[in-house]
C-alpha cells in the first residue's frame, strides 16, 4: 500500500472518529438540556430535546420521557400509552431505573394489561440488579398471586436475559 493511500485511510479514520465524537457531544447536550428543562418544569422543551435520543432508543432518554414527561399525571403530556412502551424497552435492555416504574405500570394496568405476575417479575429482576426494593412494593402483588405463579415469576426473573437490540 502506498504512502498516499495510507495517509488517506488515516485521514478518513480520524474524520470518522471526529464525527462520532460530535454525535456523542450532541447527544450529551440533548440530555443535559432536557434535564435542565425538566428541572425548570418545561416539559415541552425536555420532550423536544429527548426526541433524537428516544428515536435512537437511548434507555436514559426513554426512562426520562417515560416517567417524567408522559408518565407523570401532572404533566400536560401525560399519556401512559406512550410512557409504558418506553419504560418497557429501556427495562428489557437492562436499564435498571426503568424496571420499578414498569412494574408499577403492570400492577396498575397503565399502558399495559394489568398483571400482578409481570409486576412481580420486574420487581424481582430489578432487585436482582441491586435496585432498592421495599417489601411494600411487592407484598400486595403476592396476595394476588397463587403460590405456583410466585415460583414461576421467580424462575422467570432468574432466567431473564436482557435484549441487546
Spell out what each predicted region is.
Residues 2-12:
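Bacterial N-terminal signal peptides that target proteins for export
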Residues 10-21:
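Bacterial N-terminal signal peptides
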Residues 29-45, 49-52, 56:
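Alpha-helical segment of the N-proximal tetratricopeptide repeat
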Residues 41, 55-59, 71-73, 92-96, ...:
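Short helix-capping/linker turns of helical repeat alpha-solenoids
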Residues 51-53, 89-90, 125-126:
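Canonical positions in the second alpha-helix
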Residues 132-165:
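Terminal, low-structured helical/coil segments at or just beyond the last alpha-helical repeat
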Amino acid at each position: 500500500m502506498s504512502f498516499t493511500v495510507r495517509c488517506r485511510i488515516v485521514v478518513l479514520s480520524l474524520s470518522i472518529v471526529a464525527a462520532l465524537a460530535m454525535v456523542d457531544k450532541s447527544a450529551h447536550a440533548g440530555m443535559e438540556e432536557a434535564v435542565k428543562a425538566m428541572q425548570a418544569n418545561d416539559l415541552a422543551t425536555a420532550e423536544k430535546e429527548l426526541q433524537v435520543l428516544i428515536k435512537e432508543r437511548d434507555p436514559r432518554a426513554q426512562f426520562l420521557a417515560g416517567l417524567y414527561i408522559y408518565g407523570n399525571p401532572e404533566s400536560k403530556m401525560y399519556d401512559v400509552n406512550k410512557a409504558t412502551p418506553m419504560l418497557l424497552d429501556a427495562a428489557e435492555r437492562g436499564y435498571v431505573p426503568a424496571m420499578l416504574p414498569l412494574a408499577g405500570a403492570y400492577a396498575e394496568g397503565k399502558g399495559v394489561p394489568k398483571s400482578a405476575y409481570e409486576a412481580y417479575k420486574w420487581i424481582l429482576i430489578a432487585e436482582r440488579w441491586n435496585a432498592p426494593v421495599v417489601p411494600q412494593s411487592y407484598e400486595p402483588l403476592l396476595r394476588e398471586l397463587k403460590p405456583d405463579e410466585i415460583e414461576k415469576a421467580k424462575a422467570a426473573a432468574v432466567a431473564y436475559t436482557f435484549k441487546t437490540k
